[in-house]
């Protein structure tokens, strides 16, 4: 469900899809063919969230922000079930494994894979895969 926060509504491309049981709140931009699956929370309350083209946020995942950091998800990204992305940047063609947590200020480089259940601690830079 799309929800306003402080008068700001999510901006969802007509070709993107949000399941009814998901909550997409506030300053969120979803590009074409992006999808947010059941029971996810994507909450752009104090900063913005962007979900790139063809990226999918799978069941029970949470995307959130911090005052200092937005949450940016590039193109062709898969965020596995029950993952948490908090105030981080995930570049293009990345797989975020099920149940993993990526914390504030992290940058996950293009082509990287974050293992299921991993915790990527605050400020970590995961180098791109050439």
What are these regions (language model features)?
Residues 5-7, 11-130:
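Structural signal for interior beta-strand "rungs" in well-ordered beta-sheet cores
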């Amino acid at each position: 469900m799309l929800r306003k926060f402080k008068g700001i509504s999510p901006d969802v491309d007509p070709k993107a899809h949000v399941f009814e049981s998901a909550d997409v709140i506030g300053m969120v931009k979803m590009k074409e063919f992006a999808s947010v699956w059941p029971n996810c929370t994507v909450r752009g309350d104090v900063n913005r969230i962007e979900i790139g083209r063809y990226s999918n946020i799978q069941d029970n995942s949470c995307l959130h922000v911090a005052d200092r950091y937005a949450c940016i998800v590039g193109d062709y990204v898969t965020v596995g079930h029950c993952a948490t992305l908090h105030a981080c940047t995930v570049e293009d063609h990345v797989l975020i494994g099920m149940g993993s947590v990526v914390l504030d200020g992290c940058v996950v480089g293009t082509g990287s894979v974050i293992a299921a259940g991993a915790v990527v601690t605050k400020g970590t830079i995961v180098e791109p895969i050439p």
